[in-house]
UniProtKB/Swiss-Prot annotation:
Keywords: Cytoplasm, Protein biosynthesis. Gene3D superfamilies: 3.30.1360.40, Ribosome-recycling factor. InterPro entries: Ribosome_recyc_fac (IPR002661), Ribosome_recyc_fac_dom (IPR023584), RRF_sf (IPR036191). This is Ribosome-recycling factor. Pfam families: RRF. The keyword DNA repair does not apply. It comes from Streptococcus thermophilus (strain ATCC BAA-491 / LMD-9). Responsible for the release of ribosomes from messenger RNA at the termination of protein biosynthesis. May increase the efficiency of translation by recycling ribosomes from one round of translation to another. GO terms for molecular function: ribosomal large subunit binding. Belongs to the RRF family. The lineage of its organism: Bacteria, Bacillati, Bacillota, Bacilli, Lactobacillales. It is found in: Cytoplasm. Signal peptide: none annotated. It comes from the Bacteria.
Length: 185
């Protein structure tokens, strides 16, 4: 039963890491990356549809994204969705494909994005600490209900703390990696 608490916490830690990686992918680093467009939804025949389901997205050059719609009739809708998004990138429509040229980041923009990375990373650490608290509460509840002994509780708390420390260290390394990517010219 005690291992179930740790396994559940580790599973939730992994979900937090995946979520953080997705959020970091959406922060542009001056290089083209298809994940920049993950959050864009297109109004297609009256239904909001993710862009990656309406078109293939390729990276032909370091700072260019090429969007090839499966249905050429949707190209105007895709262009409108990109213009309305908060990407700050103007699409170039040539009738059959849309080109997005990712502008080089200024030093000021890089620093702002690095701050955003730290903020997002800090939120992930808060989520990790909340998961730890939930696991600790569950362990104390089991000890209170005499399902485990006090010694088992202490061991379990140490194991939960070690798993938490590992999860936080992974977040720190993810933050450092993304900051390095952003600040490298």
């Amino acid at each position: 039963m005690t291992n179930a608490i740790i396994e559940k916490a580790k599973e939730r830690f992994a979900h937090t890491h995946e979520s953080l990686a997705r959020e970091f992918g959406a922060i542009r680093a001056g290089r083209a990356n298809a994940s920049l467009l993950d959050r864009i939804t297109v109004e297609y025949y009256g239904a909001p549809t993710p862009l990656n389901q309406l078109a293939s997205i390729t990276v032909p050059e370091a700072r260019v994204l090429l969007i090839s719609p499966f249905d050429k009739g949707s190209i105007a809708d895709i262009e409108r969705a990109i213009n309305e998004s908060d990407l700050g990138i103007n699409p170039a429509n040539d009738g059959s494909v849309i080109r997005l040229v990712i502008p080089a980041l200024t030093e000021e923009t890089r620093k702002e994005l690095a701050k955003e990375v730290k903020k997002v990373g800090e939120n992930a650490k808060i989520a990790i600490r909340n998961i730890r608290r939930d696991a600790m509460d569950e362990a104390k509840k089991q000890e209170k209900e005499k399902e485990i002994t006090e010694d088992q509780l202490k061991t379990l708390e140490k194991d939960i703390q070690k798993a938490t420390d590992d999860a936080v260290n992974k977040i720190d390394s993810m933050i450092a990696e993304k900051e390095k990517e952003l600040l490298t010219v």
